[in-house]
Amino acid sequence: MTFKLNLEQLRKQAKERVRERRAAGESARLADVQFELARELGFDSWPRLKSYVERLALEQPFRTDLEYYEGRAYGIASVNGVSIAEARRDLAARHGFGSWRELRRHVGAMQRGQERPTPFVLAYRAVEDGDGERLRELLDRFPDLVVQRGTNGNDLLGMAGNLEIASLLLERGADPNRGNDYGWTKLHQAGYGNDRELAKLMLDAGGRTDLSARGDGGTPLVQALFWGHREVVDLLGSEPGNLRVAAGLGDPGMIRDLVGTPQAGAHREFYRPHGGFPAWQPSDDPQEVLDEALVWAAKAGRDEAIRLLVELGARVDADPYRGTPLTWAAVNGRVDSVRTLVALGADPNQLASFGGPDHGEGVPAIHLAAQAGQREAIVALLDLGADPLIRDQLHGGTALGWARQGCHGELADVLPDPR
């Protein structure tokens, strides 16, 4: 039987069953039938079913580990610039609870099995497990699952981890352009993950390349270019067409057309893909715009763009937001770009920032290349004069220590041990 989880319709279904049974000469009480209906839907009682349905327009808790919700609260606090306490209250309210304590109590009950899993929770688990058969059964029974939202406003499509599950959800009516609380769509995920097959699937389903997430200008293309991805970008358009995009795409003509124009620094409200990166406020300072573009060219290994941007005034030692050009080139294994930047004046031992506030402060490029396991970049940096025994200012580690922290102890054959 297919159920539309609408309270009015559920009440009608219960009353219709009562009428049918009484017409057949059976004894039937509305309360008993409501309980029966609730049990069929996986709930212990009619009041629990009623409470669930009343909250369907809100975000549904679907994870049973409290740490997950703590992490989401931290993200809200970071993005909105509010206290953790305020972020927790906000998160609880999004789920229909009056306080953080109430949300924690509910999640704890889910964890202990005192709250039976709702249809959305069961569907989420099927998505996580890649169980297309089970998900199909749930969608057959509860077609409205495709429009329900979980924590952070993520729907089932947004949480789908493989193409089969994503395809099934699209077939059942999931909106390819529906974003979560931050505007993040599945096409943004394709850009972020450098996933061509997912991008093709979403584009074929009508996915738009011009939608922004986490700030104006945060298009799917920009999510890819933030990390220096190259394989997926030809599918994702060119929006928002500013200098960072031109640099990441390695388009010299576009760079020349943009430098010195307002469009060069336009649509740069987006600057981080998640709250793990610290807050920053991009400005319209032409020098900052140039310097940032050089970083984005280095991320993607666009050597012609690197040389052009330096010629136009970009600084090779600039650290506009969490990383110099050399840092990002090294982390991404862009060996030719590492050599190009040093030839243009970059200091291989410059101390810079990187990643989140607890990741890199006062750290040289070779340490980050070591953590990322980029052997060829490490060899190039050593050849160019990088000192692997410098200790970073935040953790006091050498390049070999960073390699081991990144599970790349095999790099001990090229990095000296300070002991």
Report the location of each language-model feature:
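Ankyrin repeat A-helix N-terminal signature
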Residues: 125-130, 159-163, 189-195, 223-229, ...
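Ankyrin-repeat boundary/"N-cap" motif
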Residues: 116-125, 147-161, 179-186, 212-219, ...
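Intrinsically disordered, low-complexity eukaryotic regions enriched in glycine, serine
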Residues: 1-137, 141-142
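Repeat-mediated protein-protein interaction surfaces in helical alpha-solenoids
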Residues: 136-142, 222-230, 265-281
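Ankyrin-repeat-protein effector appendages
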Residues: 111-122, 222-265, 269, 288-289, ...
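Ankyrin-repeat and related helical/solenoid repeat scaffolds used for protein-protein interactions
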Residues: 194-197, 203, 210, 357-398
